[in-house]
Amino acid sequence: MSKKEEKVLINEEIVDLTDRVRLVDGEGEPKIVDSSKALEIAYNKGLDLVLVAPNANPPVAKVMDYGKYKYEQEKKKKEAKKKQVKIEVKEIKFTSKIQENDINYKVKHIKEFLEKGKHVKLRVFLRGRELATPEKGFEVINKVWDMISDVAEKQNEPKLEGNYINLLVTPIKKKIKK
């Protein structure tokens, strides 16, 4: 259990915490009873008394099977995690002296990644004197962009960051395949 999660109080822990609870037992309206009486009702039914709203006044306790409740909570958490979309960013590196056939080969891979819905970071590595005149690197990035612009969107303009010229491209929304 992580630190963020609050511990759910059950059975005797509720009796130790408070004298009275608002009891929800599935049979009609919630009613305010002594916590020991609520625990007795739960035990008579062969179930647990679970504190579902500790901050209410009085706290709300429900008669239920704690194991089943815990299982349902885990199931909901897993379902929520499945629905989260994790964006994967692939990185393709170039140099400013790259040959035409190498560009074509890398562009083919970029298009494959974009078709799968992945984001692609294009990086041109500049060495030594190339840093003084990064125009060649921008030419390479722009050439690659011209080749993939039909299947991608620019997230930003190419920019020089340290020894690299970076450009992040994402798939055009309607062109994504799974």
UniProtKB/Swiss-Prot annotation:
Q: In the UniProt record, what gene is named as encoding this protein? A: infC
Disulfide bond among the record's keywords?
A: no
Key words, A-Z: Cytoplasm, Initiation factor, Protein biosynthesis
What subunit structure does UniProt give? Answer: Monomer.
Name of the protein described by the UniProt record: Translation initiation factor IF-3
**This protein's superkingdom?**
Bacteria
Query: A GO term (biological process) for this protein?
Result: ribosome disassembly
Cite the source lineage.
Answer: Bacteria, Pseudomonadati, Campylobacterota, Epsilonproteobacteria, Nautiliales
Keyword Protein transport tagged: no
Write down any Gene Ontology CC term.
membrane
